Curated annotation (Swiss-Prot):
Region: TRFH mediates dimerization, residue numbers: 58-268
Highest taxon listed in the record's lineage: Eukaryota
Post-translational events: Phosphorylated preferentially on Ser-219 in an ATM-dependent manner in response to ionizing DNA damage. ADP-ribosylation by TNKS1 or TNKS2 diminishes its ability to bind to telomeric DNA.
Compartment(s) of residence: Nucleus; Cytoplasm, Cytoskeleton, Spindle; Chromosome, Telomere
SUPFAM superfamilies (alphabetical): Homeodomain-like (SSF46689), Telomeric repeat binding factor (TRF) dimerisation domain (SSF63600)
Official protein name in the record: Telomeric repeat-binding factor 1
Species annotation: Homo sapiens
Modified residues (N-acetylalanine): A2
Tissue expression as described in the entry: Highly expressed and ubiquitous. Isoform Pin2 predominates.
Main location (coarse class): nucleus
Subunit structure: Homodimer; can contain both isoforms. Found in a complex with POT1; TINF2 and TNKS1. Interacts with ATM, TINF2, TNKS1, TNKS2, PINX1, NEK2 and MAPRE1. Component of the shelterin complex (telosome) composed of TERF1, TERF2, TINF2, TERF2IP ACD and POT1. Interacts with RLIM (via N-terminus). Interacts with FBXO4. Interaction with TINF2 protects against interaction with FBXO4 and subsequent polyubiquitination and proteasomal degradation. Interacts with GNL3L; this interaction promotes homodimerization. Interacts with TIN2. Interacts with RTEL1.
Positions of region (Interaction with RLIM): 265-378
């Protein structure tokens, strides 16, 4: 091959002499060495490219793995924070905040691929409160079995939240069982009440102290039995709120809350004038807060690392049992639009209140908070003589404290159960409850 190349091209020396010269053996050997060196250099370059590519891919894979782990840690922090916010909204009765926080928690949960035991318990708490908030909406569906009512579903989850069955746990469990039947009877669904009773107390070996009592009440179709007055829905809610307060004290030390609290404290300790640069100050304050909480981050990451061995795969049921079937709107009991909707905190309100709350939000300016506007509108509504009359009649018939039943069976001007309670207290102070002659 070298010989063919040499013979085909004129040598430099031949050109200089004005004639072609035959290549010597030394020149031929040198040409072969040059060709070999060039070939080896090309091979070496190709090898370097091939060797360098896997290293870059490995680095990219390591970076991607680090990002994924960091996202999982951050998602865990957000889940704790949203559970904390959900508990506060539930306890304070802020239904709109409850709904928004619930939807945010749903998005976080659907993005998780695995769970620690602590995160799983957090999800159970969110699921439990969501079902309790929809407790009186019998057509709300949380289970694959459409017959299961919201309170039945809450009862099943409640058993998974707390391993130690203390007195509060037992009280809440019994109250949910009773109200799961009472809610059906209040809606006139006595057949469904029997079915709920069978599902809850179907075990023939179970010996519940109030099992026979409930069976007798169902058979008599006594919706307003004194037993239901003693173990009322409001009593159940108060007990659940006691548990929520426990969760709040437990989760108030979560990382995001601690970091946010440090930022707020840092801002409060500074005197910021309108001439200061807000962006620079904010960055500086947040940087200081981050420095203060660096140890908290390290501790949190250590906790995540230690608990990584105890992670469990996020089963489909953990996602679906939360909110996947709760996407049909927020106004379940609208008088003009009776539509099927699943699980919002407003489901325990009556139709009139739900419609009024929706309409009252429309004209509110964006610069004004919605909640104070609602309260101001409600305070301006004077109580009519007819409303006082209906309130006295309702208390006389159903008893003091059963405001939801009174609201359901008597006509009021866009009132809530809380309004009835406050008005009744005012009437007692003014000694207006004895004026029954007009009734």
């Amino acid at each position: 091959m070298a010989e063919d190349v040499s013979s085909a091209a004129p040598s430099p020396r031949g050109c200089a002499d004005g004639r072609d010269a035959d290549p010597t053996e030394e020149q031929m050997a040198e040409t072969e060495r040059n060709d070999e060196e060039q070939f080896e250099c090309q091979e070496l370059l190709e090898c370097q490219v091939q060797v360098g590519a896997p290293e870059e891919e490995e680095e990219e894979e390591e970076d991607a793995g680090l990002v994924a782990e960091a996202e999982a840690v951050a998602a865990g922090w957000m889940l704790d924070f949203l559970c904390l916010s959900l508990c506060r909204a539930f306890r304070d009765g802020r239904s709109e905040d409850f709904r928004r926080t619930r939807n945010s928690a749903e998005a976080i949960i659907h993005g998780l691929s695995s769970l620690t035991a602590c995160q799983l318990r957090t999800i159970y708490i969110c699921q439990f409160l969501t079902r309790i908030a929809a407790g009186k909406t019998l057509d709300a569906q949380f289970e694959n079995d459409e017959r299961i009512t919201p309170l039945e579903s809450a009862l099943m989850i409640w058993g998974s939240i707390e391993k130690e069955h203390d007195k509060l746990h037992e009280e809440i469990q019994n109250l949910i069982k009773i109200q799961a039947i009472a809610v059906c009877m209040e809606n006139g669904n006595f057949k469904e009440a029997e079915e709920v009773f069978e599902r809850i107390f179907g075990d023939p070996n179970s010996h519940m102290p109030f099992k026979s009592k409930l069976l007798m009440i169902i058979s008599q179709k006594d919706t307003f039995h004194s037993f239901f007055q003693h173990f009322s829905y409001n009593h159940m809610m108060e007990k659940i709120k006691s548990y929520v307060n426990y969760v709040l004290s437990e989760k108030s030390s979560t990382f995001l809350m601690k970091a946010a609290a440090k930022v707020v404290e840092s801002k409060r300790t500074r005197t910021i004038t309108s001439q200061d640069k807000p962006s620079g100050n904010d960055v500086e304050m947040e940087t200081e807060a981050n420095l203060d909480t660096r140890k908290s981050v390290s501790d949190k990451q250590s906790a995540v690392t230690e608990s990584s061995e105890g992670t469990v795969s996020l089963l489909r049921s953990h996602k679906n049992l939360f909110l996947s079937k709760l996407q049909h709107g927020t106004q379940q009991q609208d008088l003009n639009k009776k539509e099927r909707r699943v699980g919002t905190p407003q489901s325990t309100k009556k139709k009139k209140e739900s419609r009024r709350a929706t309409e009252s939000r429309i004209p509110v300016s964006k610069s004004q908070p919605v909640t104070p506007e609602k309260h101001r509108a409600r305070k301006r509504q004077a109580w009519l003589w007819e409303e006082d009359k209906n309130l006295r009649s309702g208390v006389r018939k159903y008893g003091e404290g059963n405001w939801s039943k009174i609201l359901l069976h008597y006509k009021f001007n866009n009132r809530t159960s809380v309004m009835l309670k406050d008005r009744w207290r005012t009437m007692k102070k003014l000694k207006l409850i004895s004026s029954d002659s007009e009734d």
